Amino acid sequence: MDWRPWMDAFLPPLLEALPGRVAFVGIQGSFGRGEAGPESDVDLVVVLDALGAAELAVCRGVLEKMPFADRACGFFCDRAALAAWPAFDALQLRLDTLPVYGSLEELLPPM
């Protein structure tokens, strides 16, 4: 599976379901590194302006409609949580995440 068409199908419904609330979407793991096999997970990074149970339910609803939904996993957080990360975690996220929508640079603490 090529992750790009999958992401092209995922991103518009996510942006529509959470208008103005999505700060960043990226891909990690084997797809992000170009090492994915036929059974690889789709490792997402999604950062919202604020994240609670309602927002997680919306994200889950969008993901459940996707092909290979059972392979979607990853990290969902909000701006405030990400801004408070220690530098070593922020560096790892920067190095291991391929941006698809938005930029991590404005969301992470300065290096």
Task: Report the location of each language-model feature.
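Conserved NTP/Mg2+-binding pocket subregion across the NTase superfamily
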Residues: 56-111
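A generic fold-level signal
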Residues: 20, 37-39, 85
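Catalytic metal-binding acidic patch
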Residues: 29-61, 73-76
